[in-house]
UniProtKB/Swiss-Prot annotation:
Glycans are attached at N105. Induction: By prolactin and androgen; inhibited by estrogen. It is found in: Secreted. GO terms for cellular component: extracellular exosome; extracellular region; extracellular space; nucleus. Expressed in pathological conditions of the mammary gland and in several exocrine tissues, such as the lacrimal, salivary, and sweat glands. It holds the Pfam family SVA. Keywords: Actin-binding, Disulfide bond, Glycoprotein, Pyrrolidone carboxylic acid, Secreted, Signal. This is Prolactin-inducible protein. SUPFAM superfamilies: E set domains. Residues 1-28 form the signal peptide. Belongs to the PIP family. The modification Pyrrolidone carboxylic acid is found at Q29.
Amino acid sequence: MRLLQLLFRASPATLLLVLCLQLGANKAQDNTRKIIIKNFDIPKSVRPNDEVTAVLAVQTELKECMVVKTYLISSIPLQGAFNYKYTACLCDDNPKTFYWDFYTNRTVQIAAVVDVIRELGICPDDAAVIPIKNNRFYTIEILKVE
């Protein structure tokens, strides 16, 4: 019986080892990959009826590919190629950049939206994932007309 008690008694070294393993596991859980990384670039201000180019660069840290649909939404209707929607296969080794050219004569809020969707025929062999938690990502900028 005494031998059994010695086997189950935790030594300080064992407790320290368990603590270090627990801290290491928590740190590993914090290292999650980002689903979508986006950089939306438009001028801060333009003159009335000048052509504006909006650029959206999108990438992922996931190892799997995703089908993404990108588009712009504005607070007022805009002219030009503003309403174009792009669909692409986004993989960690193949970031994408999308361009829109449009005109405006009023200050406007513009949202660049990235939806992760389920669509066949976009990614090779239709091998793509859809995140469970989030499937819509966006960023909003203000374009001032002066």
